[in-house]
Amino acid sequence: MTTIRVKENEPFDVALRRFKRTIEKLGLLTELRAREFYEKPTAERKRKKAAAVKRHYKRVRSMQLPKKLY
């Protein structure tokens, strides 16, 4: 459970922003969304493999020299 201590005379907005930042750093929202519905192990493997292929092609594309535009 994530907790933050609200300092004296600290506005609510600032405390809420700090809380959201800590939640984002821990990755709790992404994990919560992933666990919201059951995903079959085969579907999970397929999704992760597709993401890895996409990352690979993105890395290859960024390493290539740009085409000449003349």
UniProtKB/Swiss-Prot annotation:
Protein name per UniProt: Small ribosomal subunit protein bS21
Keywords on record: Ribonucleoprotein, Ribosomal protein
Organism this protein belongs to: Leptothrix cholodnii (strain ATCC 51168 / LMG 8142 / SP-6)
Protein family: Belongs to the bacterial ribosomal protein bS21 family.
BP terms from Gene Ontology: translation
GO cellular component: ribonucleoprotein complex; ribosome
UniProt key word Ribosomal protein: yes
One family name in Pfam for this protein: Ribosomal_S21
Gene3D superfamilies linked: Ribosomal protein S8
GO terms, molecular function: structural constituent of ribosome
Superkingdom of origin: Bacteria
Chain's gene name: rpsU
InterPro entries: Ribosomal_bS21 (IPR001911), Ribosomal_bS21_CS (IPR018278), Ribosomal_bS21_sf (IPR038380)
